[in-house]
Amino acid sequence: MFRGATNINLDSKGRLAVPIRYRDLLIEEAQGHMVCTIDLHHPCLLLYPLSQWEVIEQKLSRLSSMNPAERRVQRLLLGHASECQMDGAGRLLITATLRQHAGLHKQVMLVGQFNKFELWDEETWYQQVREDIEAEQSATEIPSERLQDLSL
């Protein structure tokens, strides 16, 4: 399980050093093989261990290519998916196309989200956090039953 937000610098080649606390788990779970793709709703990337991505691919393969909405999701997620292998120094190369899509510059945030990571431009991440907090503070809708059962 991946949790927490970590500031990371991309090097000049677009590589990020995976935090040490995740490296052993990623090697154990997927031999350091990862898949990076776009997020459909936010200006960030999604980074999955290969074993977790294969579950997503199975679900995507069951969607109908004849349904326009389902085909769009397949096209966007699979069409942008890029395999990346953690090197001996624990770094992952994020392709230029994906970096450009998410507006990634030197400072990025690696955000654990259970079975995957989100990869954000640092400034964009902090802006999103502010917006999310403001939305929660001003929310007028009744929380879903699942949120009502969540006790923090």
Curated annotation (Swiss-Prot):
Domain of life of the organism encoding this protein: Bacteria
Keywords: Cytoplasm, DNA-binding, Repeat, Repressor, Transcription, Transcription regulation
GO biological process, one term: negative regulation of DNA-templated transcription initiation
Signal peptide: none
Database matches in InterPro entries: MraZ, MraZ_C, MraZ_dom, MraZ_N, MraZ_sf, SpoVT-AbrB_dom, SpoVT-AbrB_sf
SUPFAM superfamilies cross-referenced by the UniProt entry: AbrB/MazE/MraZ-like
GO cellular component, one term: nucleoid
Residue span(s) of domain SpoVT-AbrB: 5-52, 81-124
Coiled-coil annotated residue ranges, if any: none
Key word Membrane present: no
UniProt GO MF annotations: DNA-binding transcription factor activity; transcription cis-regulatory region binding
Cellular localisation: Cytoplasm, Nucleoid
Pfam families given in the database record: MraZ
Major location (coarse): cytoplasm
Role, per record: Negatively regulates its own expression and that of the subsequent genes in the proximal part of the division and cell wall (dcw) gene cluster. Acts by binding directly to DNA. May also regulate the expression of genes outside the dcw cluster.
PANTHER family noted in UniProt: TRANSCRIPTIONAL REGULATOR MRAZ (PTHR34701:SF1)
UniProt similarity note: Belongs to the MraZ family.
Complex formation: Forms oligomers.
Name of the molecule in the record: Transcriptional regulator MraZ
Natural source organism: Edwardsiella ictaluri (strain 93-146)
The encoding gene: mraZ
